[in-house]
Amino acid sequence: MRVLGLMSGTSADGVDAVLVELSGSADHPRWSLLRSASLDYPTSTRQLILAVGQGEAKTASSLLNLSETITKIQAAAALQCDPEEQAQLVGCHGQTLWHRPPKRAGTGELQRGASWQMLQAPLLAQLLNRPVIFDFRAADLALGGQGAPLVPKADAALLGRTKGWRALLNLGGIANLTLIPPDAGPDRLQPVRGWDCGPANSLIDLAMEQFSEGEESCDQGGRLAETGHCDEALILRWLAEPYFQLNPPKSTGREVFGRADLTRRLRDMQGQPIANQIATLTAFSAAVVAQDLQQLSNQNHPLPIELVVAGGGSKNLTLMRELNTRCRGLRLRRSDELQLPSQSREAMVFALLAWWHHLGYPGNAPAITGAQHEVVLGVRVNPA
């Protein structure tokens, strides 16, 4: 079956689209990436998405208009990727505006989580004249799960296994980690694991936007960070914060590591040159991942033999060097080396999740999200 996958992440820079051929069994799919495309959000759209994600109050009218704009851009990306309309099914993540993980009240009662991925799915189905699977997080959240990350189980299916534990790190706005068991030995029966480590590009991008007065949306290639010096004492202090001490399952987003969080950290670095501040934020993103991997070792969990990196952050050479330095003993590779294109990977995940929905195959993993049990993810809407 040919499936379109559409993904717009927490960086809110645009939509990635893929056309994938999927066949075989659900747990060991055969796949082929046929085409890919990316479409940037207009600056005004991105700024509005980020503003809502930081908790700024907006009118119902502006949110309604935003949802229609996002949907039309998703459709345009899909048609750019699949102009001949080969796909039989579309998997669309939508644009995350807010993610609230579950938590326990003082009484011990569980408050279920909630997550808002903005999309007018019936409109998208009409514009593309194909069934759309969307709202992938809701079923896991309803079962007490985090609703995130959803990519690890799909990562394991797409990437496959090797002789040792393999780690796949996605560097989007947030850094999330997938641990894939080996293909042989006693650990082959272990479940896939995954969680959100903390900020990857979110704080760096917001800082660049602030320092450049809107002229720059990111540190291209990590060039500015490369010229600065990071504050290791400050990084150690930040690593002691509560979120980084939590054990999985755990998930987070820009509502935690967004503009308010950046303001606090910039206050900690007050008086330092801008290059040093960007260098410190970049090193911090790498240190968060390294600390999580070290905590695995402290819990007697086998360390992965390689760290496969995907997402926009893999283009930040300074961030990649920091990861290489701080994650000692791991072979660092880009997912492109394994025929899993970094830019397209998450869109491929949502194509696979849509296919799994079509097959009636569960897309979540309770060991990762904390849900009560496995469940088929997503809601299907057909063109009228």
Swiss-Prot record:
Name the EC number(s).
2.7.1.170
Cell membrane found in the keyword field: no
Query: So where does ATP get bound?
Result: 9-16
According to UniProt, the reaction catalysed is: 1,6-anhydro-N-acetyl-beta-muramate + ATP + H2O = N-acetyl-D-muramate 6-phosphate + ADP + H(+)
Q: What class of enzyme is it?
A: transferase
Q: Name one GO molecular function term.
A: ATP binding
Disulfide bond positions: none
Task: Recite the UniProt keywords alphabetically.
Answer: ATP-binding, Carbohydrate metabolism, Kinase, Nucleotide-binding, Transferase
GO BP, sorted A to Z? 1,6-anhydro-N-acetyl-beta-muramic acid catabolic process; amino sugar metabolic process; peptidoglycan turnover
Question: Which SUPFAM superfamilies does the record associate with it?
Answer: Actin-like ATPase domain
The yes or no answer to whether the keyword Transferase is present is yes
What InterPro entries does this protein map onto? Anhydro_N_Ac-Mur_kinase (IPR005338), ATPase_NBD (IPR043129)
Pathway(s) served: Amino-sugar metabolism; 1,6-anhydro-N-acetylmuramate degradation; Cell wall biogenesis; peptidoglycan recycling
Which PANTHER family would you find in this protein's record?
ANHYDRO-N-ACETYLMURAMIC ACID KINASE
**Member of which family?**
Belongs to the anhydro-N-acetylmuramic acid kinase family.
Purpose of the protein: Catalyzes the specific phosphorylation of 1,6-anhydro-N-acetylmuramic acid (anhMurNAc) with the simultaneous cleavage of the 1,6-anhydro ring, generating MurNAc-6-P. Is required for the utilization of anhMurNAc either imported from the medium or derived from its own cell wall murein, and thus plays a role in cell wall recycling.
Q: What HAMAP family does the database record attribute to this sequence?
A: AnhMurNAc_kinase (MF_01270)
Annotated protein name in UniProt: Anhydro-N-acetylmuramic acid kinase
What is the scientific name of the source organism?
A: Synechococcus sp. (strain CC9311)
Its encoding gene is what? anmK
